[in-house]
Amino acid sequence: MADKKAPASGWPIVSGEYVVGNPESCVAVVTLGSHGLDEAAIEAGAAISGPCHTENLGIEKVVANYISNPNIRFMLVTGSEVQGHITGQCFKALYENGIGDDGGIIGAKGAIPFLENAGQDAISRFQNQLVEIVDLIDVEDTGKISSAIKDCISKDPGAFEEDPMILDLEGGGGEAGADESTSIKPAAPETVLLEARMRMISEKINDAALIAKFNSGYYNGKIQGIAIGLFLSLLIFSLL
């Protein structure tokens, strides 16, 4: 049997709308923008399961709960991707690349992928503690999710060798999922999409203006060519 450790007192240390299972399980599940998958994940053996909507504070809260429980060695990212925030891809980028000096998640494609409270030490712990992030983004089939959880459990390497690490988040609260009405105010998905569409419309207007300018020049050049041709024809006939 794999060796286990006690998680931090009161784990999960950050409150939220997640469901908690066996704290000695090696698997934690994030269901991104989907709901209704958590009970199935817990029944399959996950330690914790819940949604995560934002690529900044939401990710920090997930990290805080994971690194405070050394038994968690696998992260299963599933459920529908969050439009605009692209949280699932941001989790993968965080695990693979970490953060820069400015707190930005390297390679993340979300709207505001910056971690203000989780520093290099916490992210390094997150990367080292996890053996693997299992990518089931946009999968909502509870059968596939349960099967993936059980597969991870069969490969349980035991608890991470270091003690629980406590990440202090300003304003408290929790999301793995959680209430996000704290100091960081991420952009709503609708706002991000609206801005993207406005940029696209602006680009199309610019393209249309260029086409109109080209057509206008072409038309004017064509008229000038006809006029010159008529003038030369008259000149030739007058010389005959």
From Swiss-Prot:
Single GO BP term: methanogenesis, from carbon dioxide
Transmembrane parts of this sequence: 217-234
Protein topology in the membrane: Single-pass membrane protein
Primary subcellular site in the record, as a coarse category: membrane
Enzyme Commission designation: 7.2.1.4
Manner of cofactor binding, per the entry note: Binds 1 5-hydroxybenzimidazolylcobamide group.
Protein name (Swiss-Prot/TrEMBL): Tetrahydromethanopterin S-methyltransferase subunit A
Gene (name only): mtrA
